[in-house]
Amino acid sequence: MNKTSNNKLIYSVLMLVCVVGFWLFENFYTPNTYSQQTENGPTTSVASNLMPSSTTGDIVEHSHYMLSYNEPFEQAEWVAYTLKKEHLTNDDRKRPYFIEDPKVRTKSADWRNYKGSGYDRGHLCPAGDRRFTEQAYNETFYTSNISPQDREFNAGIWNELEMQVRIWAKQHGELFVVTAGVLEEGLNEIGQEDVDVPRYYYKIVARGNGDDLKILAFLMEGKQSSKPLKQFVVSVHEVEKRTGIDFFQKISKQQQDQLEAKVDTGSWKFKF
């Protein structure tokens, strides 16, 4: 064997080792959980009096958000979290791998269902809202916290809504947020586990408490739009009708009827 042939063989073997090594790392050397770390940082307890109902009973509580998992659709029917002004930091975090949620009884969908599907792994509790500690950031990479989203939608109007919520958190100090895709029959599916692709997504934002409680709900089709965010505002009743979820079940019936039926954009300043 001449020198040129020998070099080609060595190069080919090295390439094969690299490819196999990357595959093994990607498939077998990811962590089992992101919830074992203990770090000092801002508190993120979710306001119990604002928690929505669960149509499945499969409620999971993480350190920095809660969710209700819907196994037939292989994603959360809602993710709820508190967003405070002090949560919004510019800490540089290393992006971790997406992993299955160890707290979901039936196991959340594997991230590989999204591979080659053409859809983004769209965060529900945004990673950008949880940069204040490594644990908080990493917890957003459980697959129970993602939903298939069109890439232009995820990077466009949905991202604008997330940025608008951050602006409100800075203005008002603290918000309660609940969000997910609308899970309904007849949706397209991706991957071996048949992860459903929602046609619509909702986000409900609340601030204050008692008689000072202010609520704003958004419902938008999962495709890019140049419309201002105000055009996607709906009543909470509309989102409840579409999802079957009772979003503010623990406040008085009188206050529910009053707040959930109206659309109050006047109490919120819009940038987008």
Indicate residue ranges for each PLM-predicted region.
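Domain-level detector for secreted/extracellular nuclease and nuclease-toxin modules, and
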Residues: 2-272
